[in-house]
Amino acid sequence: MVLGWLFERGAGGWLWSVLLCLLLGTACHHPPDASGGRNLLLGKKPSAASGVSGVSRLTDGVAALTGDDWETELNAMFRDEEASVTYDLGAVVPIHGIWFETDHNDDYRFMISEDGVVFEQLWDSPATRAGGMQDRWTDKLDVTGRYLRIQPTQGDGRYAVAEVAAFSELPKVFPIEPARQRGTALQTVVRTRVLLFAFAAVAFLFATCEGAPLWWLYLCGLLPLVAGISAFESINRAWPVEQRGVSLVRAASAAIAAAAVLRELYAPPRFPALRAAVFGCLGASALIAVLAFYNLGRPQFWDGQTQQPTPVHLLDLRQYYQTAKYFDEIGYRGMYLADVAAYVEDIPGATLESLRDTPMRDLATHRLSSIGEQRDKIEAVKKRFTPERWQAYKTDARYFREMMGQRDYLRYMLDYGGNATPVWISIAHFLFSAFQANTTAFLLTGLLDPLLFALTFAAIGWCFGYRTMCVVMVVFGANDFIMYGSNWSGATLRHDWLMYIALGACALRRGRAALGGFFLALSSTIRAFPALTLVSASIPAAWWLTEYWRSHERRPTWAQIQELQRPLLRLLVAALATSLVLVALTTLRWSWPAWGDWFWKVEKLNADPHANSVALRGLVAGWEQGHYQLLMARWPLYASLIVFYVLGVVLALRDRPLEQAAIAGLILVPVVFYAANYYIHVVCLLPLLALERRGSADAPRLSLADGWIWLTLLLLCIAQYWTVLVTDMPLHFHLATVLLFAALTAIVVALVRGNVREGRLDFLVHYLQTKRAA
């Protein structure tokens, strides 16, 4: 490598010389006085600033082009009407003129003070008609003062100022004509700096190696540090960051993690990867990805009452809080009926007749209906409640109506309602019955998921290793299947089933088969499809039985099975016992028809075509009208692909440990089920298919096949950035489906090839060679 050549020849001196020249050149540079007069503010730093980002832009001597966009890197941003900037002019001086450039449709006020405490109004600048950034000025001032303050007074809430100048003596040419530049949109600046940060981190990984001089390591370490600070500053200035920017942060975190895996896995023996660099980049990318999962900390949902963003996932909680808390009265089918009945009683002037044309979904059939068509059911639903329970329901419904706003509250009656199993309903019923719907309580219950995340990530780090934990965290936060609005952050216990799968795999990794069975069964009874993990966990034992039959031409005895397959038996017995107990308890609590209703609902959801599904069925038949006819016409292809993936998983699991076998079942979730996009979050657990070795520092931590699995998943996260640019949501999810199955195919092939290379499928290779020779 080039760096190794430089180190060996002591070529650091010229690098320091170049760096010193650059620093001196930068230090000597100062922006010119663009005003051509005595600008009292040029180059000054404010003595006080509140609620303003990019404040240095106000006095740097560079203005925006007239008519330019308001949200660029040339402008300082004022958060609201309370934001202000104050400058100390150094002494009491006369002021005869002020010039500044700002967005056209906002009003600003300048104030003056001699002591910095008591300010008097100096000049009010009203909005102008011309669009974009516009110059404003006055030469009619005749005051003295030491402290000058500027603040917006009213406008559209988006306040931007590019440059400010104040004069004791007016220049010969006034208004002035400063140096101008075309600004770059702040969101573009964010994306650029995020890309540069990712590039700097990757460069740091490949520019360092074990044994490199300490000065070189520190110098290289400055690259991601400076780039990271720059990216953070741009995000802070552009806040809130648009969805495209958040998605690029996700892709960047995945790119850094992929580079770390690649650097360590394929490091030349002469220049091994610097372990501290790999660990640092993996850890940083993991934290960034999880932060991106939470939209970089910006609440994603809207509080219609305060007209402010809220972290509470109102759309999800409206469905599940009421369904779970009042399951005795409304079950899976009656929520919208009760919502309309409560609405009519609560809203003055609202009647079923006036709302008769309002659309709603009939949760008993899943077809679109209207309030007029459902009138008889709406009038009857109140009879299911006691008077006390009905008043409680109305209070809870009123909370969601006020928070969502009446228009959205009625509009979202087109959703399909809660579809969790009676097991999850029972857990949520116990939790939600403890409080009346309110934001504080939902914020607290919303912390249950992050606590589960932290526990699960820690368990993965303990059981599988630090690298595995980081890659899982990156894929968890960097995959974009969930998208805005479907992201369950801010909801309550919506990722529990996912974390239980991971905890089950951790238990199996530590040899706690019964505990693993408990967690996998708990996940399965909450969301059904995780039962595939129990099926796939049995595949290695099926291989063993087949091999035993081929070798001995008889079945093994029960004693032999108990001795050689004890972990699997403990897993299955614990899973069966857990499932039976949970189903029995929920049946006693809700009655058996509750399970029947749930089966019907899931069957209906799985049968109806959905634009946001990410599954093999959608890959083959698309999402448009005529979905079923197309699926039937292409059934040979559909069936062949199912066989391909199932057979691939079966071949991949010969002689594999239980934890790998269980996780491999998740590959089949979008193959067997018509899964919605948010359930494809299971991909975050697929890094557990790669087994990180723990041994000497010199030993490779991953096999090439396992490393390929990690790289495939990280590349999937990177590639999803381009799907975010597709605004047609059905097409977006179809492209996401294409990417998913490309990744799953690569993973299955890597697993099978790994088995072939390690001799686990020698019998199959020999059989195929014999057939070919024949």
For the regions a protein language model found, what residue spans apply to each?
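Hydrophobic secretory-pathway targeting helix
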Residues: V2-A34, A277-L296
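Disordered, acidic Ser/Thr/Pro-rich linker "stalks" and the adjacent N-terminal cap
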Residues: L23-I95, D103, E114, D124-M133, ...
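Short, surface-exposed beta-strand/strand-loop-strand elements in extracellular ectodomains
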Residues: N105-V118
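Exposed aromatic-hydrophobic patches
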Residues: M133-L141
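Short beta-strand-plus-loop segments that form exposed binding edges in beta-rich domains
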Residues: I150-G157
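Primarily membrane-embedded glycan-assembly and transfer machineries that use lipid-linked glycans
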Residues: R180-C506, R510-A513, A541-N677, C684, ...
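Hydrophobic transmembrane alpha-helices of multi-pass, membrane-embedded glycosylation machinery
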Residues: L520-T525, L532-L545, I667, V682-L691
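Aromatic-enriched
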Residues: A690-A774
